[in-house]
């Protein structure tokens, strides 16, 4: 960007900031409800609405309760949800077979939501950690190391299971090598060419995921283990661009950076480099951190929510996956 020479007092940058109308006219970034995807936690039973202690205001919902929530989301103009399953211990195994059960929790959720709200998009998680006894995102060898290609074969089954149930978008969050291309080819071969893939391309081995693992019930299974041999090192950004480039070449329709706030630089670099549909996930730890500050009166809730979400979009995000989606959309409706 090359501007002609400017100097004070002929140029006064405050001039356009003086009144609301001119501030609005020169605003470079705006938020709408159409920018958001709401992550939701879905559980078995009926009439169940169970609070997640580490995420104030977030609940584990049975399918019937989720449908009531979806009615509100549609009315607010939120285009999509991302359901995550709360899987009980009896359905967890070393081979994660429940992940591709056609009568499992997620396929039933997809069918129920699509029957009631066909216009609402659904993006399902393709990963094995809710279904494994060890809480890792894949199938392990005797030493606990994730077997990449064996895991990808299981992820293909999971993605096809979700596609058969009627999902709009599958979102592989596992960080296995080659899984986007393998899933894309399987979808094409099985008549699901219009099922989109949201690739968790730059998913970091972050300390911000704790409340999510509590919510889905995988924290106890994972214990003190970590996921550093497949999720990305928080120190790296060039590697993120390599991962994103690979996923685009393998057939991803959207790519994602996760978490959000600590990785705005990666988000900006990704948008500048690829100009490709780009999502960011404001993860559970970010939500919990802000919620704690709000509860103590340390930050203005509405102002900080909107500033944070605006920051994601200004940094390059086209899509913001956030637990604040419903609240933010309500605020935007008020104007």
Predicted segments with their positions:
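N-terminal amphipathic/basic leader segments beginning at the initiator methionine
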Residues: 1-27
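Alpha/beta enzyme core
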Residues: 2-7, 19, 32-37, 44-335
């Amino acid at each position: 960007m090359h501007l002609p020479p400017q100097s004070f007092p002929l140029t006064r940058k405050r001039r356009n900031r003086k009144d609301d109308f001119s501030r609005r006219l020169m605003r470079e970034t705006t938020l709408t409800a159409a920018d958001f995807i709401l992550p939701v936690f879905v559980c078995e039973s009926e009439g169940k609405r169970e609070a997640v202690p580490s995420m104030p205001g977030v609940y584990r919902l049975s399918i019937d309760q989720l449908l009531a929530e979806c009615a509100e989301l549609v009315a607010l103009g939120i285009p999509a949800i991302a359901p995550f399953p709360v899987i009980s211990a009896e359905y967890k195994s070393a081979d994660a077979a429940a992940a591709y059960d056609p009568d499992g929790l997620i396929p039933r959720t997809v069918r129920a939501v699509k029957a009631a709200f066909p216009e609402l998009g659904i993006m399902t998680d393709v990963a094995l950690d809710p279904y494994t006894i060890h809480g890792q995102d894949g199938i392990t060898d005797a030493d606990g190391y994730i077997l990449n290609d064996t895991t990808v074969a299981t992820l293909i089954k999971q993605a096809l299971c979700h596609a058969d149930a009627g999902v709009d978008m599958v979102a592989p969050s596992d960080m296995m090598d080659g899984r986007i291309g393998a899933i894309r080819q399987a979808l094409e071969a099985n008549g699901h060419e219009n099922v989109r893939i949201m690739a968790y391309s730059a998913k970091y081995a972050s300390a911000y995921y704790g409340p999510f693992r509590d919510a889905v019930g995988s924290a106890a299974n994972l214990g003190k283990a970590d996921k550093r041999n497949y999720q990305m090192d928080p120190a790296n950004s060039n590697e993120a661009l390599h991962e994103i480039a690979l996923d685009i070449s393998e057939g991803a329709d959207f790519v994602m950076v996760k978490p959000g706030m600590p990785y705005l630089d990666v988000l900006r670099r990704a948008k500048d480099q690829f100009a490709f549909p780009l999502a960011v996930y404001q993860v559970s730890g970010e939500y919990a951190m802000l919620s704690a500050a709000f509860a103590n009166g340390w930050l203005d809730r509405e102002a900080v929510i909107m500033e944070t979400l605006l920051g994601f979009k200004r940094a390059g995000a086209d899509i913001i996956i956030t637990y604040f989606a419903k609240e933010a959309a309500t605020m935007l409706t008020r104007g």
